[in-house]
Amino acid sequence: MAHKKGASSSSNGRDSESKRLGVKRFGGQQVKAGEIIVRQRGTKFHPGENVGRGGDDTLFALAAGSVEFGVKRGRRLVNIVPAEEAAAEATA
């Protein structure tokens, strides 16, 4: 095996593809059922009302409505306020 590198070879130049993690829908935004709200590794955000959690810890909407972020018992939660409730609160 050669102990000197041949011309123009490099041991660099490899990296993994970015995973595009993060919050996809922010507080106050309207979502439809099934829309992804947060892509994450581990449970940085926990599912709250009307929010489901996928096998890769992705949070998604179970109902149409407005996204709401909050904290409960030191955990960051993501809730969906259903569209009917949001309309009722606005008129009240």
Swiss-Prot record:
Keywords: Ribonucleoprotein, Ribosomal protein. GO terms for molecular function: structural constituent of ribosome. The keyword Ribosomal protein applies. It comes from the Bacteria. InterPro entries: Ribosomal_bL27, Ribosomal_bL27_CS. One of its GO terms (cellular component) is cytosolic large ribosomal subunit. Residues 1-26 are annotated as: Disordered. Gene3D superfamilies: 2.40.50.100. One of its GO terms (biological process) is translation. PANTHER family: LARGE RIBOSOMAL SUBUNIT PROTEIN BL27M, RIBOSOMAL PROTEIN L27. Belongs to the bacterial ribosomal protein bL27 family. NCBIfam families: L27. This is Large ribosomal subunit protein bL27. It comes from Corynebacterium aurimucosum (strain ATCC 700975 / DSM 44827 / CIP 107346 / CN-1). The lineage of its organism: Bacteria, Bacillati, Actinomycetota, Actinomycetes, Mycobacteriales.
